[in-house]
């Protein structure tokens, strides 16, 4: 059977092992061809590692009834191909195409959407409890990676499920030893020992079957069989690094470890697990990037890939040179400063490469901490370090810092601790879509007392703000910066001067329209000013630098002299930078028209950053068009008012 003929996952139920193996090969081929030719890139390693797992599991389920919850979602590419999306799989992560993650609105087989890690067991348990309350009996399966299992939420769900012995729930642990980078911590180390242990549950259940088949006495031995099963499991566990005992003690029946690329073994394990009452965990050992040697060899870089040569695995060179990314400039600058200040500690939550902290990890490993997928712990860990005089720098994507909001308020801000938050991927992130957009940090941080917010206009100003953040000791401070390449300005290797807290700068003066731009929107605003000049509209452009505190000493007098004030930000309008300016104008009783440009109250779907910014009107052309339309509308209003005055006289 060809993969293109699969329109419903239940078609797998009647296929032979050889047919499943053929589908596994086809899935990998389709995935690789799509990744190699994608204009926006896509996740690769995670999906290649779960092909056999997906096929074997779906063969044992009735997916018209049963529900599978995938953690994060970037490991669910085979799932997408098997659930009616094969023919448009080539559009994945592109504007108007299918999502790179699971979306309930995209398919009836996507039972729970996710882009952040560690949520699957909680969601699956909720569905299982609801099922039992309604008296139904479908199966619920959560598939979670060992990286996501470093997140505390996963253990909260396991703790809850373990106290519900009558609630049937299967958790499949997809253990490849990686998140994006290699996993850290005691739990991954424990799981790695389990990967090397022979199956435990198989031994116990095999013994039970043999004893029950004894003539005359087999059926009367149930209590003794149970005790003997436990003895076998305990003895086996002790001999094999106590395999699975943690999960057993938490109330789960442990099955595994199972070879995640052996279809026959997977089928046996899943059928066995389906027959076990209560919560069960199936431990499946997989290889990230399985079936594509370059991805198996370079598991970090092939977690996700842009266009590459399928024959060699090497990425195609860029069509033109690009400036270094904000992340790389941040990592380089922090590393330079850390070399001279041993108090500086870089902290990340399983994203050392993505945040640029890999350079610090390599050069100064004693000044680098990776906590795993544990943002809450990262923030409070930093708070504890700050209490002891260290200078913790928490580098986290804007979207992931949301997960530690209580810790920011309760553990950092209330205590006025000098923790420096560096929010990568702030604003539009592109093909990852709404689960990863960094739209909300200005709003959710601006409302917190003691918090300082800043954003650089370019990569050179970012270097100065890194110094500013480290030197600021009066309380918490946050810096946001976008994904991707910098503007292309010259960069100094040292001698970066801090920026005075709350001080903006005028970049262009003398206009009747005042443009207050924040962070990544400064350069598009300067370009928009040139476009407006061609239409006879003069502008003053200010690099705000700080959303909190605002430079009211600079902004308010300029606003009083202007016919229109415009704020531009790459973030949500509700509660954002524009709201801060509006509040300041209102408090000062300055009555001037205000145009706020930013992200409206909508979810921004996946597309390239350029496509998203154009659609939002946040590129130079869009900014100029919105301002020009507003100026013309105001001129029309003034003309109408003047005409009304003349008419009344």
UniProtKB/Swiss-Prot annotation:
<keyword id="KW-0460">Magnesium</keyword>
<keyword id="KW-0808">Transferase</keyword>
<keyword id="KW-0479">Metal-binding</keyword>
<dbReference type="Pfam" id="PF02779">
    <property type="entry name" value="Transket_pyr"/>
</dbReference>
<dbReference type="Pfam" id="PF13292">
    <property type="entry name" value="DXP_synthase_N"/>
</dbReference>
<dbReference type="InterPro" id="IPR020826">
    <property type="entry name" value="Transketolase_BS"/>
</dbReference>
<comment type="function">
    <text>Catalyzes the acyloin condensation reaction between C atoms 2 and 3 of pyruvate and glyceraldehyde 3-phosphate to yield 1-deoxy-D-xylulose-5-phosphate (DXP).</text>
</comment>
<keyword id="KW-0414">Isoprene biosynthesis</keyword>
<comment type="pathway">
    <text>Metabolic intermediate biosynthesis; 1-deoxy-D-xylulose 5-phosphate biosynthesis; 1-deoxy-D-xylulose 5-phosphate from D-glyceraldehyde 3-phosphate and pyruvate: step 1/1.</text>
</comment>
<dbReference type="GO" id="GO:0009228">
    <property type="term" value="P:thiamine biosynthetic process"/>
</dbReference>
<dbReference type="GO" id="GO:0005829">
    <property type="term" value="C:cytosol"/>
</dbReference>
<dbReference type="InterPro" id="IPR005475">
    <property type="entry name" value="Transketolase-like_Pyr-bd"/>
</dbReference>
<feature type="binding site">
    <location>
        <begin position="115"/>
        <end position="117"/>
    </location>
    <ligand>
        <name>thiamine diphosphate</name>
    </ligand>
</feature>
<feature type="binding site">
    <location>
        <position position="146"/>
    </location>
    <ligand>
        <name>Mg(2+)</name>
    </ligand>
</feature>
<dbReference type="GO" id="GO:0008661">
    <property type="term" value="F:1-deoxy-D-xylulose-5-phosphate synthase activity"/>
</dbReference>
<feature type="binding site">
    <location>
        <position position="176"/>
    </location>
    <ligand>
        <name>Mg(2+)</name>
    </ligand>
</feature>
<comment type="subunit">
    <text>Homodimer.</text>
</comment>
<feature type="binding site">
    <location>
        <position position="176"/>
    </location>
    <ligand>
        <name>thiamine diphosphate</name>
    </ligand>
</feature>
<dbReference type="InterPro" id="IPR005477">
    <property type="entry name" value="Dxylulose-5-P_synthase"/>
</dbReference>
<feature type="binding site">
    <location>
        <begin position="147"/>
        <end position="148"/>
    </location>
    <ligand>
        <name>thiamine diphosphate</name>
    </ligand>
</feature>
<feature type="binding site">
    <location>
        <position position="375"/>
    </location>
    <ligand>
        <name>thiamine diphosphate</name>
    </ligand>
</feature>
<dbReference type="Pfam" id="PF02780">
    <property type="entry name" value="Transketolase_C"/>
</dbReference>
<dbReference type="GO" id="GO:0016114">
    <property type="term" value="P:terpenoid biosynthetic process"/>
</dbReference>
<dbReference type="InterPro" id="IPR009014">
    <property type="entry name" value="Transketo_C/PFOR_II"/>
</dbReference>
<feature type="binding site">
    <location>
        <position position="292"/>
    </location>
    <ligand>
        <name>thiamine diphosphate</name>
    </ligand>
</feature>
<keyword id="KW-0786">Thiamine pyrophosphate</keyword>
<dbReference type="InterPro" id="IPR029061">
    <property type="entry name" value="THDP-binding"/>
</dbReference>
<comment type="similarity">
    <text>Belongs to the transketolase family. DXPS subfamily.</text>
</comment>
<dbReference type="GO" id="GO:0000287">
    <property type="term" value="F:magnesium ion binding"/>
</dbReference>
<dbReference type="GO" id="GO:0019288">
    <property type="term" value="P:isopentenyl diphosphate biosynthetic process, methylerythritol 4-phosphate pathway"/>
</dbReference>
<dbReference type="InterPro" id="IPR033248">
    <property type="entry name" value="Transketolase_C"/>
</dbReference>
<protein>
    <recommendedName>
        <fullName>1-deoxy-D-xylulose-5-phosphate synthase</fullName>
        <ecNumber>2.2.1.7</ecNumber>
    </recommendedName>
</protein>
<dbReference type="GO" id="GO:0052865">
    <property type="term" value="P:1-deoxy-D-xylulose 5-phosphate biosynthetic process"/>
</dbReference>
<dbReference type="GO" id="GO:0030976">
    <property type="term" value="F:thiamine pyrophosphate binding"/>
</dbReference>
<keyword id="KW-0784">Thiamine biosynthesis</keyword>
<feature type="binding site">
    <location>
        <position position="74"/>
    </location>
    <ligand>
        <name>thiamine diphosphate</name>
    </ligand>
</feature>
């Amino acid at each position: 059977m060809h993969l293109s003929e699969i329109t419903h996952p239940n078609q797998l139920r009647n296929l032979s092992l050889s047919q499943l193996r053929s589908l596994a090969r086809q899935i990998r081929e389709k995935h690789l061809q799509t990744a190699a030719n994608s204009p926006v890139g896509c996740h690769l390693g995670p999906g290649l590692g779960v092909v056999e797992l997906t096929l074997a599991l779906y063969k044992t389920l009735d997916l018209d009834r049963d529900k599978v919850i995938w953690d994060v979602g970037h490991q669910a590419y085979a799932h997408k191909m098997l659930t009616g999306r094969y023919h448009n799989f080539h559009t994945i992560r592109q504007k108007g195409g299918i999502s790179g993650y699971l979306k309930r609105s995209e398919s009836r087989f996507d039972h729970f959407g996710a882009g952040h890690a560690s949520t699957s067991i909680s969601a699956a348990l909720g569905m299982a409890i609801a099922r039992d309350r309604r008296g139904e009996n479908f199966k619920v399966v959560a598939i979670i990676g060992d990286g996501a299992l470093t997140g505390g939420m996963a253990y909260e769900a396991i703790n809850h499920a373990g106290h519900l012995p009558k609630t049937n729930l299967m958790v499949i642990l997809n253990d490849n030893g990686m998140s994006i980078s290699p996993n850290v911590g005691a739990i991954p180390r424990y799981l790695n020992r389990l990967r090397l242990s022979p199956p435990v549950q198989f031994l116990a259940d095999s013994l039970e079957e043999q004893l029950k088949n004894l003539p005359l006495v087999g059926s009367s031995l149930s209590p003794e069989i149970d005790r003997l099963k436990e003895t076998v499991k305990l003895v086996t566990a002790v001999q094999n690094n106590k395999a699975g005992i943690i999960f057993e003690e938490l109330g789960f029946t442990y099955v595994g470890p199972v070879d995640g690329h052996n279809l026959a073994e997977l089928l046996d394990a899943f059928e066995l697990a389906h027959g076990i009452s209560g919560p069960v965990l199936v431990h499946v050992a997989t290889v990230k990037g399985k079936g594509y040697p370059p991805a198996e060899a370079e598991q970090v870089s092939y977690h996700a890939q842009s266009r590459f040569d399928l024959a060699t695995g090497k990425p195609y060179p860029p069509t033109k040179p690009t400036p270094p990314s904000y992340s790389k400039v941040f990592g380089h600058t922090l590393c330079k400063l850390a070399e001279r200040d041993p108090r500086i500690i870089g902290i990340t939550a399983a994203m050392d490469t993505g945040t640029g902290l890999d350079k610090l990890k390599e050069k100064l490993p004693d000044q680098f901490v990776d906590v795993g997928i544990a943002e809450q712990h990262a923030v409070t860990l930093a708070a504890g370090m700050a209490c002891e005089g260290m200078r913790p720098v928490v580098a986290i994507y804007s979207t992931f810092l949301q997960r530690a909001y209580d810790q920011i308020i309760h553990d950092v801000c209330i205590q006025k601790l000098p923790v420096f938050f560096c929010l990568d991927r702030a604003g539009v992130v592109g093909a990852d879509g709404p689960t990863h957009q960094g739209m909300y940090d200005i709003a959710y941080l601006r409302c917190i007392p003691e918090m300082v917010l800043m954003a650089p206009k370019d990569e050179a100003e970012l270097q100065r703000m890194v110094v500013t953040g480290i030197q600021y000791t009066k309380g918490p401070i946050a810096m946001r910066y976008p994904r991707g390449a910098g503007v292309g300005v010259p960069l100094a290797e040292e001698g970066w001067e801090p920026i005075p807290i709350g001080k903006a700068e005028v970049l262009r003066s003398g206009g009747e329209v005042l443009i207050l731009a924040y962070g990544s929107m400064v350069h598009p605003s300067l370009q928009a000013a040139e476009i407006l000049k061609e239409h006879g509209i003069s502008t003053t452009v200010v690099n705000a630098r700080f959303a909190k505190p605002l430079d009211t000493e600079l902004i308010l007098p300029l606003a009083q002299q202007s016919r229109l004030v415009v704020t531009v930000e790459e973030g949500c309008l509700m509660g954002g930078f524009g709201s801060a300016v509006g509040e300041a104008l209102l408090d000062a009783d300055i009555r001037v028209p205000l145009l706020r440009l930013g992200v409206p109250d909508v979810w921004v779907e996946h597309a390239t950053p350029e496509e998203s910014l154009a659609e939002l009107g946040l590129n130079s052309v869009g900014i100029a068009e919105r301002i020009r339309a507003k100026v013309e509308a105001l001129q029309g209003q003034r003309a109408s008012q003047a005409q009304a005055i003349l008419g009344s006289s």
